[in-house]
Amino acid sequence: MKKYSICIVGGGSRYTPDMLAMLCNQKERFPLRKIVLYDNESERQETVGNYAKILFKEYYPELEEVIWTTDEKEAFEDIDFALMQIRAGRLKMREKDEKISLKHGCLGQETCGAGGFAYGLRSVPAVIDLIKSIRTYSPKCWILNYSNPAAIVAEATKRVFPNDYRIINICDMPIAIMDIYAAVLGLKRRDLEPKYFGLNHFGWFTHILDKKTGENYLPKLREILKTPVDVQTEPLFQEKSWKSTFEFMSQMINDYDEYLPNTYLQYYLYPAKMRNKENPEYTRANEVMDGNEKETYERMHKIISLGKIHGTKYELTSDVGCHAEYIVDLATAIANNTNEIFLIITENKGTINNVSKDMMVEVPCRVGSNGVEPLVVGSIPAFYKGLMENQYAYEKLSVDACLEGSYQKALQALVLNRTVVNTDVAKELLKDLIEANKGYWNELH
């Protein structure tokens, strides 16, 4: 069986340790020869790299090569897979996005609203430059992109690399939601198969099927979830803001009686309520910096000081979180041509036959060694079509603004966003966001 070479782009990320653990767990199905960590933040990556040395010595001794580097040629040359998870500006810029949005009376969120717009205009140039570099050194490698905001990034990669079917854009949020459903049902997520349509962070489950029996659990789940439930899943989702998000799902299910919504729809359907719940002095970015990110690096530093994982409380388990599972499972499906079903962000091309053909939709797809094959969704009701067309117009204009350096397109994008709408507010937001993002955004004229 072939052994693959992979590069984790964003090697210093707090998500990387779980990804490395998942690669250990998956080594029989997805054997590796070489793992490269690439990041432009050498200090953070040094910590992850030293942790990786200990991890692989104990759990993956047959791995031939592990390196970490800030040099693109060294990182990207002759790789089979690039797993991308970059955050342009890191969490400090996310904090600015959220607090500037709240200052102007809009909700402050990472990927939605004005915060997501700002993040998108930082991410797109960085992702495009990295993909061009990867293609210089490994023209045929698979690029599996997790970088947020995934909807805007996917729209940009479609335009700049229109015929590159080996670029696949994904998001783990629907899978995280399915973990909740599985826990409610007393099942495992891998026992379930979703039918789903929408845009990234903007979609609906129409069926939750039992893979063995074909039973559709959606009606049962809707009834259960009309009342908030406290479900124990991975530690990240036990944080206060995530618990609040999952609890609010019951509000959406009671108000809209057809499907099961992606949790991010709370920001678009109840923007004032979401804004009023937020603390303008301490946002989700602060919570992450003080919580999960800090804890992740503290854990790695402790392992490095111990020099081992075996025989400590940090012993590797099979529970690594959906973020790591999803991208490694996707790479495994491509490598082994399994034709498994994944939720992928892909060009519509008639998959949903009554929305724009060029729309970047998030739908179930079969995935194998030839790439992604979307499964037909058909027509969707007017309410969902209207929401999606409006949101996609915002996403398109955001990418236009970035690639063309157009202030007018940026203003139009923000006014179309359901969390902003007001032109005067959008102008003030843009003024502050342009100032905050100097050095990250392409200049707007």
Swiss-Prot record:
Mn(2+) binds at residues 171, 201. It comes from the Bacteria. Its EC number is 3.2.1.-. The record marks 110 as: Increases basicity of active site Tyr. NAD(+) binds at residues 4-71. Disulfide bonds: none annotated. Gene3D superfamilies: Lactate dehydrogenase/glycoside hydrolase, family 4, C-terminal, NAD(P)-binding Rossmann-like Domain. The active site is at residues 172, 264. Its cofactor is NAD(+); Mn(2+). InterPro entries: GlycHydrolase_4_CS, Glyco_hydro_4, Glyco_hydro_4_C, Lactate_DH/Glyco_Ohase_4_C, NAD(P)-bd_dom_sf. Substrate binds at residues 94, 148, 284. Binds 1 NAD(+) per subunit. Binds 1 Mn(2+) ion per subunit. Transmembrane segments: none annotated. Induction: By maltose and methyl-alpha-D-glucoside. Homotetramer. This is Phospho-alpha-glucosidase PagL. It comes from Clostridium acetobutylicum (strain ATCC 824 / DSM 792 / JCM 1419 / IAM 19013 / LMG 5710 / NBRC 13948 / NRRL B-527 / VKM B-1787 / 2291 / W). The gene is pagL.
